[in-house]
Amino acid sequence: MGLAREKFKTLTEQMFYVLLCLQQECCGNDILLRVPEMTAGRVTIGSGTLYNLLEQFLEEGMIVETKVEGRKRSYQIAEKGCSMLRQEYERLNAQAEDYRRFTGRCSK
C-alpha cells in the first residue's frame, strides 16, 4: 500500500472534488469556483483549506504543478491522484450498494 493510500485512506468530499476538478489543468481560483458549481452549492471549499490540500497532494505526488505565472499556479491530477479518485469512487459505490441491500426502516 502506497504512502498516499495510507495517508488518504478515504477522501473527504472536498478532496474528492478538488481531484475531480484537476482532471483539467486549473488554478486554485478555478477550483474555488468550480466545486460549488459542480455540486449545486452543496460543497464549498475555503481558500485556506484548498491551498493546504493542494500542498498535501503535491507532496504525495497526487497532482503536479503545470504552470507558474507570478503568484498564480496551475495544477493537474497525476496518475496517483487518478488512482485515489477511482478507489474513492468504488468505495462510495460499495457503500451505496450496502445501503440498498441492507436498509430497512430507514428507507421510508
PLM region descriptions:
Residues 1-11, 92-95, 101:
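Intrinsically disordered, low-complexity serine/threonine- and proline-rich regulatory segments
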Residues 5-49:
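N-terminal helix-turn-helix DNA-binding core of bacterial DNA-binding proteins
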Residues 31, 57, 92:
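Alpha-helical transition-metal enzyme core signature, strongest for iron centers
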Residues 49-50, 81:
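Helical "lid/switch" subdomain of P-loop NTPase nucleotide-binding domains
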Residues 51-56:
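Short, hydrophobic-biased segments on the C-terminal half of alpha helices
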Residues 58-70, 76:
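Beta-hairpin "wing" of winged helix-turn-helix
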Residues 70-89:
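Basic, amphipathic "hinge/linker" alpha-helix immediately C-terminal to the N-terminal HTH DNA-binding motif
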Residues 86-108:
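Amphipathic alpha-helical dimerization/coiled-coil segments
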